[in-house]
Structure formats: structure tokens, C-alpha cells
Amino acid sequence: MARSPASMTGQSTAFPSPIGGLNTRDSVDLLPETDAIRLDNFFPARSHVQVRNGYDDHVTGLPSTVESLMVYNSGTANTMFAASGSAVYNVTSAGSVGAAVITSLSNAQFQSVNMTTSGGSFLWICNGEDAPRHWNGSAWATPTLGSVTAANIINVEVYQERLFFVLTDSLTYGYLPVNSIAGTVASVNLGSVFSKGGKLMAISTWTRDGGSGPDDNILFFTDQGEIAMYSGTNPSDATKWGLVGVYTVGRPIGRRCMMKVGSDCYLVTENGLLPMTQVLGTGEAAPNVALSDKISNSYNDSVVEFKGTFGWQGVVYPKGGYAAVNVPSSTAGNFIQYIINLETGAWSRFTNQDGYAWAVFNSDLYFGGSTKVYKADSGTDDSGGAIEAVAKTAFIYFGGRSGPKRYTAIRPVMASDSELEVSIGFDTDFRDGTTTFTPSTTGSIASAWDTATWDSATWGSPITTHQAWFSVADIGWNAAVRVRTSTTQQSVRWLATDVRYEVGVGL
């Protein structure tokens, strides 16, 4: 029940929205007031949290699940391709899918890289079962690759003007001559370098100084959590190639376990999201080195349940200011993305985006679902459906820890670009109230939701603030606020919350 603050008594305390992000690591008794116990489909910006944008259908009518999105970047034209079923399709333009551009494939789980040589710009793709292909901006071709079974190439990276390859089910990597997209592949077995055995999963580059030069390194990752770092320009010349070190970290999850952020690269592992600047700088992967340390409990739960499911991927989205770890599920609707604000390091969780593959194309974010490619971070609904955003703040000891309080009213301060309907919940003493929409009929929302359409005040037109007091009737040492909104037509921000309470003896 919304009511005028003039009729209320007692103290009032304001605290910010949970801009510190999701925290599933620490005891609920010790969470900072800026952290959240739950933060689904809210993005923690520096000054507020906001409901994420929606997604739109981009290309429809693909034959099966889209398991790969591959982007060709050149100086003249960019193109995006999707692998679905046994074929690859051009999905650059929105609309119904056209005819396949590659057919008769064994699987649709590709890794890819862009490389520019004197012969042009190329997208080079491989899947570990079929012969690799490359696209030059106008046509696909199959490169001639000598001294290796080409179909065994399952991952690819560019380093020092060469293509480097991971070969399936082995600790062997291959590489081509400088500025080449085809030719004789030289092979190197790293079995004597790694002490835990296993197989190579991925290759990435890591630059200490942010540029190409003596500090530009190549990293080889095994499925057992070992990293071999090399530096140099020519693996066939011992005077121009050398092992820098071997490091032990968490086991990587999937082939798409690397994402590059500036000169750094992040590794998606069973132990969390690890930045190479920290891991390779310290030579170890202590728990607090993980960027995901603050969400370690929920992250670990996801690893235990889904680590064997295809679709784990790290993706960096500069336009949105965040990176995401995609966690797939065998059940539709249960996919999640752990989201980290690249500026503040705050985390949240996105849901209802069932993406098996992710890519940034022309600065926009896309994901591949079941028979469709979607454009993410677009619009205010999820392909016509509502965006369900739910948050729960930390439990805060208003007025200190010296005694219980009687809580009488709360006022979340929200902002949106149209009339806003939001549901509010209120919990005390670490209780976990209902998470269903249950409009109050008594004016009390101690363990339920109260739904109201708020009065508005101009706030940076066309954005308006929504401020209404909600009556509560509860006693406790601490309290947490829950917010839930279901929206299809508006942008929503949560700015702060006011809580009114009375401190008394013997309450």
C-alpha cells in the first residue's frame, strides 16, 4: 500500500541500489550494503542498477540449434556466419535464412580466427572432424594442408603472423609458415612439457606491455589445467623461440574458454574466470585471483551441474561494457550468463537468453539459439516476451547491531521512460520471502510482494523517477528489500532505497 511519508514516524535511512553486484561468496550477515543476494537480469552500473535490454530475432528458419557464430572482419565488408546442423549459413542480414554456403558437415561446433595476409583478409574455421575452410570475403575454399590430417584441426589462433592449430585428442600443436593460410603444417608435441598429461584445448596470445614485441606471448592450454607459455617468432629456430614457463590453473571448460580483454585474456575454468595478468604474474591461481571470486558459490554450482554440457563460452562485449560467461543447460529456459561490469568488476546474472554460441558483429552482440540467431542487448522485450528482473539486497542492520527495529515503510527510488509497475518485497533476519507476485491486500509486505503503479516526477526527460512509500509491519535486527519487475516496453533503473524504522527497547 503506497502512502504519504508525512504520516510516518521514526528514523529514515537511504542506501544505494546494489551497484556492488551479486555476492554469493560471503556470509549474508557480512554483505556490504551495496551488494546483492540475488541480481537477475539487472546490470550493475556505477551509479545504479538497470534492467538489461532485451533481444530480437535476427535470422530465423535455421534447421537446428545454432552451435557456432563466426564473424569475418575486413576493411571493406564484415560478414557473420552460423553453423547449424550439418551446414553453415550467411546470417549477416536480418530475416529468413538463405541457402547453406557449406554443407555435409560432421558437426557444427567450430572455432575460428581472422587473419590478414598479402593475399587478403580471411576467416579461418575448423571443427576437429571436417576439413578446415576459409572465407575471403566473397567465397569459401578448403585450404591444402600438408603433413597433417587436416580434419584433426580443432582450434586455431594467430601469433606472430602465423596460424597455430590445436590437434584433436593430443598435446600436439601445428603451425604454418609466416603469412600463410595453407601449406605444410609443422607439428610440435608438448608431451614432455606438461606433467599432467591430457590434451590441448585452446591457444591464445597474451601481451605484457599491450603491444606486439618481445613481451608478446603464446599460451597453450590443456584440459588438465596446465598452461605452457612461449615467446618468440619461429618455433623451428631455438634461438628465436623459447619456453617462458609452465603454470597450473583450473581446468578450462570447453574449447571457447578464452576471451581477450585489451592486452589481457581471461580463461573460463572450473575454478572461475581467471585473468592471465594475475595468474601468470603470480605463477599460481589462488582462489582470490579469480575475477569471479565474489560469485564463487553460484559459479561452482554451475560448474558441478553443467560443465559437461556444450555451450560454455566467454565473450567480451565492449559496447555494453561487460564480459559474459555463458552457462548452457540441457533444459530450455535454464541457460544463464554470468555478467561482469568491466569498469567496476561487479557481477550479475542474466537469464532467459538460451544461447549456445555468442559473437560480437559490427559492435553488436548476437547469440545462436534453437533455429534462430538473436540480436542481444536490443529493445525492451525478449523476442516479444517480458523481461523478468529480480533482485534482493543485502541484509542491512539499520541503526546498528545493538537491537531490533520496527520497520514501518520502504521507498525504492526507480526511474523509467514510461509508467512503471514494480513489485516490492521485504524480509527481516535473513528470511527468504516468497518470489511470486502476490499483491498485498492488507498493506503489509513483510513476507510477500506489494504491487503498485507509482506516481512520477520528471527526471532527465523522457526519463522519470518513481517514488512511493510502501507500508510494512515487521520487527527484526536487519532487513533486506526485494524488487521484481516484468517489462516489455520500458527501460528501468533502480537508483536507491529509503527505509523508515523505529528503534526501541524490548521490541
Model-inferred region functions:
Residues 81-83, 124-125, 161-166, 214-223, ...:
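Hydrophobic core segments of beta-strands in well-ordered, beta-rich domains
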Residues 54-60, 98-103, 141-146, 188-194, ...:
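A short beta-strand motif characteristic of beta-propeller blades
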Residues 1-98, 104-123, 248-264, 270-507:
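Beta-sheet repeat architectures centered on beta-propellers
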Residues 219-247:
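Surface-exposed extracellular loop regions of Gram-negative outer-membrane beta-barrel proteins
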Residues 137-160:
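Asp-box/WD-like beta-propeller blade repeats and closely related beta-sheet repeat scaffolds
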